[in-house]
């Protein structure tokens, strides 16, 4: 890691021995371990260990779960909120497990579209609900800091499975709950 940063500092014209930079390689290495710890965790385990047989057959919504991730194209952050709705069949998941699922997938190099899809597909596979919907809203620093430089742009993605995809009324109910 130190060799990488020494080359990086040289390439941008910076003095690697400058006081403020001496510990930077170590600090960044620790930061990267934290930012990308999602590679060392299995998202399926997070859900499998946190569900129980339930009697609820109405919609359950976990709204505005904050996340941050790193764009795999530019290695810059993107961040925002994810909302997950589902209609149980037999399994109800602990609410913190939804946040954990989001955290595991977001702590990897990502694109927003794949992040949204991975959350929905894993939830659908493990919990087997009658339907699941995932909506992700994010700001991308790669869009704000370079290229088109649009600081206020918000990107929205959604993935729908089961009843949310088949039934417009179910989808509308979820969207109404997000507004309230």
Swiss-Prot record:
According to UniProt, this protein's pathway is:
Cofactor biosynthesis; 7,8-dihydroneopterin triphosphate biosynthesis; 7,8-dihydroneopterin triphosphate from GTP: step 1/1
- Has keyword Nucleotide-binding? yes
* Broad EC category: hydrolase
UniProt cross-references to Gene3D superfamilies, sorted A to Z: 1.10.286.10, 3.30.1130.10
A Pfam family matched in the record: GTP_cyclohydroI
To which protein family does this belong? Belongs to the GTP cyclohydrolase I family.
Q: What's the name of the protein?
A: GTP cyclohydrolase 1
Lineage, top ranks: Bacteria, Pseudomonadati, Campylobacterota, Epsilonproteobacteria, Campylobacterales
Give the gene that encodes this protein: folE
């Amino acid at each position: 890691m130190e060799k990488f940063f020494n080359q990086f500092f040289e390439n941008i014209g910076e003095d690697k021995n400058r006081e403020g930079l001496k510990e930077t390689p170590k600090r960044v290495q620790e930061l990267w371990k934290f930012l990308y710890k999602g590679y060392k965790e299995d998202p399926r385990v997070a859900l499998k260990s946190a569900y129980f047989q339930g009697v609820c057959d109405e919609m359950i919504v976990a709204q505005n779960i904050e996340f941050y991730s790193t764009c795999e194209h530019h290695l810059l952050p993107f961040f925002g909120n994810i909302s997950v709705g589902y209609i149980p069949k037999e399994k109800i998941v602990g609410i913190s497990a939804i946040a954990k699922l989001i955290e595991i997938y977001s702590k990897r190099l990502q694109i927003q579209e794949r992040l949204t899809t991975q959350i929905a597909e894993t939830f659908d596979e493990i919990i087997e609900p009658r339907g699941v919907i995932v909506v992700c809203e994010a700001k991308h620093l790669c869009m704000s800091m370079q290229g088109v430089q649009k600081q206020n742009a918000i990107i929205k993605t959604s993935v729908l499975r089961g009843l949310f995809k088949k039934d417009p009324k179910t989808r509308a109910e979820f969207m109404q709950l997000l507004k309230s």
